[in-house]
Amino acid sequence: FNEYYSDSKKAIEIEETDGEQTLVIPNLRPDAAMQFLSRRAYSGSNKSSLYRFFETREKYYFCTSEYLTDKYSGFEGISNEERNRLFFNYRVLDDNTGTGQLKAQQSINDVRYGKKADSFAEMKGGAYRRNVTELDILNRTRISRQYDYTSEYKDYKAPEDLKLTHSQEFIDSYMPSALAPSTTLITDFPQIGQNKGDLDKPYQHFYENYTTKPAVDYHMNLNAFTIEINGRIALYPGMVINLDLYKFSNTVAGTRETDTQRSGKYLVMNIDHRFTGDEYKQSVLITKGGLS
């Protein structure tokens, strides 16, 4: 970062990584090189290790979503004015009163849900379970391990406690470990607790990065959706907002009942700004990795 972003006046906020790695970076653009490092980075405290490199108006970030959730999801001690800035209410009819227009600045204009779960793709891609065999060419050892998202996901920090998209019974019946995708990794480093040997090379976390990152990333993207708001609110990727959504069936009927599964804290993933004449809209991609 210091070499290729030396002309930038923006600071970078970095979440510390764990472990030592020796990497040869291919001939990549600076941003692609940072993404390359994010794919190899490992965190012992934030179990997903799903590092991202991204830029906002204020600075650059190199961190996990768990780091952002820990640092920016607390609303305790924040004034009502600041707190309300992060709350959004779905509205059907415009309220043209003075108070109504103030509320409109924090109201959702549209909700666009993303793709539905594809169970066949999840079976094939190992969205819940994966089998990994590590072949240690130096020590001539073979280690087989099974990754199970259903037993690990509660250890991954999200804006709120999550539920699995499928029931445990469905996953056990149609995505058993015995039928999970299998991959073989060639390693040249000792396992945890083994002697480093003559190369003095520490454990490289191949297994953790190969299994955990794709699974967590899949569920975060699967459960992401887009909200549209008037462009008057200071939002940026990495912010945690508190979202109020109502059940659409009740809203159309003229009543409002909170959708408890989809309301709550969300992590802002991306923002698109659109200007049409004198209208300024923001399309905000948000996720919390699952339902509450």
What feature does the model see in each segment?
Residues 1-11:
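Glycine-rich, acidic and aromatic/proline-enriched surface loops and short helix-turn segments
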Residues 12-112, 116-120, 127:
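Short beta-strand-centered interaction patches in the first periplasmic/extracellular domains
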Residues 1, 60-62, 227, 243:
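Generic low-polarity alpha-helical segments
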Residues 80, 84-292:
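An acidic/polar, Gly/Ser/Thr-rich interaction patch typically located in mid-to-C-terminal regions
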Residues 9-14, 214-215:
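Short amphipathic alpha-helical segments, especially helix-boundary/capping motifs
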